[in-house]
Design a protein with these regions (language model features):
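Surface-exposed helix-capping loop/turn segments at secondary-structure junctions
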Residues: 1-7
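Catalytic core of non-heme Fe(II) oxygenases with the double-stranded beta-helix
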Residues: 9-82, 92
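A short hydrophobic beta-strand segment most commonly corresponding to one strand
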Residues: 36-38, 97-110
Length: 110
């Protein structure tokens, strides 16, 4: 990345608590460059974060490179995931009996 002398600055942060049956629908993070999530609690059976390959719509006539346009990552407590904010993602229904807890944030170039 060419940051043109700027540095990533965290400009928003929030807590996500997903009880059993909770989910986050597919979304992107507007007005940000870099987004991420730190996992505080990820009990066994907690739902993954699922990223969608945005190139799929542009390759309708091309044969698929793999079976899915989705990439899932199972959260582990104490881990941090970061991605570019334009990347569409979601969290399917939490099937764990305990809460899935994370702290998410957005960064801009300051």
């Amino acid at each position: 990345w060419n940051l043109r002398g700027g540095k990533p600055v965290c400009d928003s942060m929030w807590i996500n608590v997903l009880p059993e049956g909770g989910s986050h629908t597919s979304h992107i993070h507007t007005n940000a460059v870099l987004s991420g999530t730190y996992y505080v609690a990820a009990p066994e059976g907690a739902s993954p974060i699922v990223f969608e390959d945005p190139r799929h719509a542009m390759m309708m006539a091309a044969p698929p490179r793999n079976a899915s346009i989705y990439e899932s990552r199972i959260p582990k407590a104490g881990t941090l995931m970061m991605w570019e904010s334009w990347l569409r993602h979601e969290v399917p229904m939490n099937r764990a009996k305990e809460d899935r807890i994370s702290i998410s944030f957005n960064c801009v170039i300051g």
